[in-house]
Amino acid sequence: MYDYKIKLGRNIKEIRQNARLSVNQLAYYFGVKPETLKDYESGNLSVPTLILSEYIDIKNDNGKEVKKWINQHLS
């Protein structure tokens, strides 16, 4: 049986990896614990719509805005 949450989780993990963002970086950006982000990526938790739309933006700009935001907030 096709499991939508697992497929979605794999897709968002691939987006994060392609943008060369770590779990910790992206968790910080989203304001969630790294364990929560891992649960999204494994399909154990449903991804909130707001976070899912952010993944689309990350895919479109290859994580540039996220990296910029992280650098501004860690400086």
Predicted segments, located by residue:
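A short, Lys/Arg-rich alpha-helix, primarily the initiator
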Residues: 1-18
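The alpha-helix within a helix-turn-helix
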Residues: 16, 27, 56
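Short alpha-helical DNA-recognition segment
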Residues: 20-38
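DNA major-groove recognition helix of helix-turn-helix/homeodomain DNA-binding modules
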Residues: 48-69
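Short acidic DE-rich linear segments
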Residues: 71-75
